[in-house]
Amino acid sequence: MSEREVSTAPAGTDMPAAKKQKLSSDENSNPDLSGDENDDAVSIESGTNTERPDTPTNTPNAPGRKSWGKGKWKSKKCKYSFKCVNSLKEDHNQPLFGVQFNWHSKEGDPLVFATVGSNRVTLYECHSQGEIRLLQSYVDADADENFYTCAWTYDSNTSHPLLAVAGSRGIIRIINPITMQCIKHYVGHGNAINELKFHPRDPNLLLSVSKDHALRLWNIQTDTLVAIFGGVEGHRDEVLSADYDLLGEKIMSCGMDHSLKLWRINSKRMMNAIKESYDYNPNKTNRPFISQKIHFPDFSTRDIHRNYVDCVRWLGDLILSKSCENAIVCWKPGKMEDDIDKIKPSESNVTILGRFDYSQCDIWYMRFSMDFWQKMLALGNQVGKLYVWDLEVEDPHKAKCTTLTHHKCGAAIRQTSFSRDSSILIAVCDDASIWRWDRLR
């Protein structure tokens, strides 16, 4: 995306539609948008060139697994039902690793989502009657780039939507879909970036997690690197996922070292670093911004999973995390009665509250998602089946599940995303296919 031929568009909040972006000298071809649930738009070959190494061997009967039996989340009838209304396939035929709806749009605005895979970033708009309209497509100048993750935010001055993307080359790119330009990029990680997340309350604070074993916190308004989380007691292998809690005071990270680590960003040291990142002005000083190096997490455990931990999300003060063991585990640091904000780094207890069981999902880098209100949880497996759990239950053990299948969807579903109003669920697959499921009211 270094050389760019960009058609200019007036700055407004409506995204220019159906523009093909040449972010390189390559011809950018249009994703194949033919197809609905009844035609043959989707083939069922699984993509082979995933650029992700093999999953380590899964050991279902590993010692110590018995303690999990007490919290099995039996599937009962779920009150949510969905219908597959459309599918399409991007023409690069490479795995789509990430999908995200823009939750920052205003009510009444069209529902826009982005997909990432190969060296392509594509924006779509959902319309009634199942229509998915191509808005824009961006191609990286480097044919070897493989985007793994994307995250939406907005410009706090202009309110323009912004999309951050990153992948195998370890470069974060910020795209403004209104001006249709890649407006900034950040280089710092020594290897691939596996996940990007924006702070829930500050649209400028971007978290990135990497194959280089570290997490980085960036301020995209002042282009500063606020902090690096990793080192002495950090992750010992690739960091695969991380999430902010609802208030943006804590980060939970997880990775290939089987561990989950808690990092507080509401400490005096971190609050001060964030403030200083806003005050920093390179035009008024010769000194570079000093990033914090956080070597010690505020809590760490390897007692939840026995394999790569590839997805983690906060649910209130509880944690949802998964490995390639066919279960999402719900747990909390410390004992049941402990306050999460008073947990000490030396704490060795964890409390497992239950688990969501499913099947045929023992490859890694398969990520679950929740809707905006955290009432639904969705995960796809490696044979194209979608699981949706109803989280609105008093006892987590009673979480009900519905399974969504389509006879033409047979490739691994890498990620799912709900629209902000929960009316649409999008799933993206290893064969470059995109599936739209609409909720039946």
UniProtKB/Swiss-Prot annotation:
Post-translational modification: Methylated. Binding to histone H1 'Lys-26' promotes mono-, di-, and trimethylation of internal lysines.
Induction: Expression is induced by E2F1, E2F2 and E2F3.
MF (Gene Ontology): chromatin binding; enzyme activator activity; identical protein binding; methylated histone binding; transcription corepressor binding
Modified residues (Phosphothreonine): 55
Effect of residue 148 to A: Abolishes binding to H3K27me3
Superkingdom per UniProt: Eukaryota
Keywords, alphabetical: Acetylation, Chromatin regulator, Chromosome, Disease variant, Host-virus interaction, Methylation, Nucleus, Phosphoprotein, Repeat, Repressor, Transcription, Transcription regulation, WD repeat
Residue numbers of N6-methyllysine PTMs: 66, 197, 268, 284
Consequence recorded when altering residue 97 to A: Abolishes binding to H3K27me3
Gene3D superfamilies: YVTN repeat-like/Quinoprotein amine dehydrogenase
SUPFAM superfamilies in alphabetical order: WD40 repeat-like
Pfam family, one: WD40
Subcellular localization: Nucleus; Chromosome
Region (Interaction with EZH2): 81-441
Residues carrying N-acetylserine: 2
Biological process, per Gene Ontology: cellular response to leukemia inhibitory factor; facultative heterochromatin formation; genomic imprinting; heterochromatin formation; negative regulation of DNA-templated transcription; negative regulation of transcription by RNA polymerase II; oligodendrocyte differentiation; regulation of adaxial/abaxial pattern formation
Family indicated by similarity: Belongs to the WD repeat ESC family.
Name of the protein in its database record: Polycomb protein EED
Organism per entry: Homo sapiens (Human)
